[in-house]
C-alpha cells in the first residue's frame, strides 16, 4: 500500500513535509518525496491530509470485563478497540488499573484479545485500582511488583501509584523502589494533596529523572502565583528530568491552569487522555479532542503530534513505536485539520473557543487498515465487478466470502 501525497509529520526522523509512505508486509517500507505509484498494489490518495505515526496514548484505563463495580479494574474501564482506531491511536498504555496480583488476568482478558497494542503501568497495589484497597499499604509490595514487571517486560512499561489519601509518602516511595528494582519509570497520580507531603517535594525530591507526574493541569497542582506566573519550582523539576503528562481524565484538566502555563512555556511533555467511563463523554472525549485543545492553545501542529507519538514512546522506553522509520511496524494515522468554529470543554465545564479541530481519516495498524472514515481506501460500488450479496447461496454474511471468491 502506498499513502501518496500527504504531509508527513514524524518527530523522530525530523520530517515535516509532503512525502509518500510505502507499507509492505506490515512494516514501513519507504518514506520519500515521490514513490512511483506503479510499484504499489494499492495507492491511497492522502493529499491535503497529515500522515503521522500511530498515536500513543500513555494514560488510559482499559481493564474492562471483570464485573467489579466502581473500579478501574472493572466497570470504570473501557475495552480499547472501540476508542482507539477511530482517533488514530494504535497504542494505549493502561495506567495502573491492574496490580502485581491481577495483571495476568488483565493480560488474558484484554491485552491478548485486543487489536490495539496494549501496554501497561503496573499498580504498586496488588489488586490494582479496586477502590478502598488502594489505601492499604500492606498491598504495596515493591519486590512483588518488580518481579511481575520483569516477568512481563515486553508489556509492563512502568509502575503506577494513584489515589492514595494518607499523609505518608509510602505509596510514592514503594512505587519508586519497585521502579528502581525493575529499572523502569514510575507514573504518579498524587491522590489527595496533603500538607504533610507537599507536591513540590514530590517533583523536586521523590521522583527520579524519567519518572512521570500525570494530571499536570489538575486544579490542586500549585502552578501559578498570585500574579498568574508559573511557579519556578516546576521548571526546576523539568530540568532535573521529571516528565509532566496531561492525563486529562474526568476531573484533572483546567483551562485556568493550562492556558497561562502554555503561554509561559510550561506545556506537557506528553499528551494523554486518561480514558475511562467518566471521561469519554465529558470534556475529554478522546485523544484527538485533547490534542485539539493544545492546538488551539497555540502549540504548533508538529509539536502536538510529537507529544502524542515519539515523546511518549521514549518515555515508556519503547522507541520502536511512535515513528515512521523504515522497518518500523506500520502503525499510521492519517489526520485532517478541520477549520471552523469549535468549542472545547475542561473538566470543570469551562469552554475554550477554537478554530481548528483534528479528525482521523485513516488508521493503519501493522499494515492493515483498521479505520477508514470516508472510505478513501475503497472502490466505488458501481465500479466493482459482480460480488456476492445477501440472498446469494454462497453469501456467508461477511466480506470474507467475496474475498475468497476473488482469490
Regions found by a protein language model. Name each.
Residues 46-112:
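Metal-associated gating/positioning segment near the N- to mid-region
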Residues 256-339:
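His/Asp/Glu-enriched, well-ordered alpha-helical/loop segment
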Residues 6, 21, 26, 48, ...:
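Divalent metal-coordination and catalytic microenvironments
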Residues 6, 329-383:
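C-terminal cap of metal-dependent C-N hydrolases
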Residues 1-2, 7-54:
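Histidine-rich, glycine-flanked metal-binding segment
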Residues 158-281:
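Active-site core of metal-dependent hydrolases
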Residues 73-83, 137-149, 196-203:
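Short, acidic/polar
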Residues 91-145:
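Mid-domain alpha/beta scaffold segments of enzyme catalytic cores
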Amino acid at each position: 500500500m502506498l499513502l501518496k501525497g500527504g504531509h508527513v509529520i514524524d518527530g523522530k526522523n525530523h520530517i515535516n513535509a509532503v512525502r509518500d509512505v510505502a507499507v509492505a508486509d506490515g512494516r514501513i517500507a519507504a518514506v520519500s518525496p515521490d514513490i512511483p505509484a506503479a510499484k504499489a498494489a494499492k495507492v491511497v490518495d492522502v493529499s491535503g491530509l497529515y500522515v503521522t505515526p500511530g498515536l500513543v496514548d500513555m494514560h488510559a484505563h482499559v481493564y474492562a470485563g471483570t464485573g467489579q463495580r466502581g473500579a478501574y479494574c472493572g466497570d470504570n474501564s473501557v475495552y480499547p478497540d472501540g476508542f482507539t482506531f477511530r482517533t488514530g491511536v494504535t497504542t494505549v498504555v493502561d495506567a495502573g488499573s491492574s496490580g502485581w496480583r491481577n495483571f495476568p488476568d488483565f493480560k488474558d482478558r484484554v491485552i491478548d484479545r485486543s487489536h490495539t497494542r496494549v501496554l501497561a503501568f503496573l499498580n504498586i497495589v496488588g489488586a490494582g485500582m479496586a477502590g478502598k484497597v488502594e489505601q492499604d499499604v500492606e498491598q504495596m509490595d515493591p519486590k512483588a511488583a518488580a518481579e511481575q514487571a520483569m516477568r512481563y517486560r515486553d508489556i509492563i512499561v512502568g509502575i503506577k501509584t494513584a489515589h492514595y489519601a494518607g499523609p505518608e509518602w509510602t505509596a510514592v516511595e514503594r512505587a519508586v523502589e519497585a521502579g528502581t528494582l525493575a529499572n523502569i519509570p514510575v507514573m504518579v497520580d498524587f491522590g489527595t494533596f496533603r500538607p504533610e507531603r507537599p507536591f513540590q517535594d514530590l517533583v523536586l525530591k521523590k521522583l527520579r529523572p524519567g519518572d512521570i507526574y500525570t494530571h499536570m493541569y489538575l486544579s490542586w497542582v500549585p502552578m501559578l502565583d498570585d500574579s498568574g506566573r508559573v511557579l519556578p519550582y516546576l521548571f526546576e523539576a523539568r530540568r532535573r528530568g521529571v516528565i509532566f503528562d496531561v492525563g486529562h481524565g474526568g476531573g484533572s484538566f483546567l483551562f485556568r491552569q493550562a492556558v497561562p502555563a502554555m503561554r509561559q512555556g510550561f506545556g506537557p511533555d506528553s499528551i494523554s487522555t486518561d480514558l475511562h467511563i467518566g471521561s469519554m463523554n465529558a470534556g475529554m472525549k478522546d485523544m484527538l479532542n485533547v490534542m485539539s485543545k493544545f492546538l488551539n492553545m497555540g502549540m504548533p501542529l508538529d509539536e502536538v503530534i510529537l507529544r502524542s507519538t515519539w515523546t511518549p514512546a521514549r518515555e515508556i522506553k519503547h522507541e520502536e513505536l511512535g515513528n515512521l522509520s523504515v522497518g518500523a511496524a506500520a502503525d499510521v494515522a492519517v489526520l485532517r485539520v478541520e477549520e471552523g468554529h469549535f468549542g472545547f470543554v475542561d473538566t470543570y465545564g469551562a469552554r475554550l473557543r477554537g478554530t481548528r479541530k483534528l479528525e482521523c481519516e485513516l488508521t493503519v495498524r501493522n499494515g492493515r487498515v483498521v479505520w477508514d472514515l470516508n472510505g478513501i481506501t475503497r472502490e466505488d460500488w458501481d465500479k466493482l465487478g459482480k460480488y456476492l450479496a445477501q440472498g446469494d447461496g454462497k453469501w456467508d454474511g461477511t466480506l470474507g466470502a467475496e474475498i475468497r471468491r476473488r482469490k
